[in-house]
Swiss-Prot record:
A GO term for molecular function: ion channel inhibitor activity
Tissue specificity note: Expressed by the venom duct.
InterPro entries: Conotoxin
Organism classification: Eukaryota, Metazoa, Spiralia, Lophotrochozoa, Mollusca
Organism the protein comes from: Conus vexillum
Signal peptide stretch: 1-23
The protein's name: Conotoxin Vx15a
Keyword field contains Nucleotidyltransferase: no
UniProt propeptide residues: 24-49
Amino acid sequence: MEKLTVLILVATVLLTIQVLAQSDGDKHLMKRSKQYATKRLSALMRGHRQCIPQNVSCEEDDECCSNLECKCTSAPDCNFPKCRA
């Protein structure tokens, strides 16, 4: 049932993109909708995940909550970066 739901969502996104591409709409709007559709589809495929809060160890920026980056502040060759603003 879950696979069917994802398939329906993907089909809906693709049809929406096709309709927008064929219309005389604003090109900026089309670009935005494609970006949103891509991000939404990517999020659906990954499933639910929790973000890492500030000052907790991380490996990549994508793991950190909004407006945070995975970085070191103490030394240039830091081995344990944390999510920081």
